[in-house]
């Protein structure tokens, strides 16, 4: 379980997080929605201890994450970056198993390649691409390779940062459904940040809306369309009139 209580974060005089309270149940898939620039990525970085928050508390399975920047702490996480973030200079299988090869587990290259093969199959790719380089793959295939890398270490918690950015609608749906499949089959806790409502409907068990530095609404995915929250209604329907300012 991940618990956030009164988390605040500012950069200079600009407050990004103004007291975030959030409870993320173990094994659930939470999607954090909100317009661009509302602090979704900053919030994820605070959970990962990549940014130090100014006030509040973040507990991961009952342990506060402040100053937890050691390898053991990060081993519990997987991450699918917005741009994929694959290494162009190494083959696909090494991209997938990169973290395993850098770990203290002393895994052999042959074992790492076998794990990469298994993860490729999970994301619907053939293993005959393992010795290719990222530049030889399509954007959708690269995204699936990045997803395979995110699950290579069998993490307990996976973060998805705008997972369908830059993809056409068909491939976006492929990625959304793969994420949902992996979350269910692996039983992981998933946290996704997006402004894509279609992605939200496929991936989420629970939804939280972040705006003005705070969580404005939380609920189950089947409550999203009947939230009776003006901000949520404006956002999911793309309305120009409402409590959310369009001056951003």
List each model region and its residues:
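ABC ATPase NBD coupling module
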Residues: 65-78, 224-227
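Conserved catalytic motifs of ABC-family nucleotide-binding domains
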Residues: 154
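Catalytic Walker B motif of ABC-type/P-loop ATPase nucleotide-binding domains
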Residues: 158-161
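Short coil-to-helix segment of the ABC ATPase nucleotide-binding domain corresponding to the Q-loop/switch region
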Residues: 90-98
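Conserved ABC ATPase "signature" region
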Residues: 109-128
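Helix-to-loop junction immediately C-terminal to a conserved catalytic motif
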Residues: 48
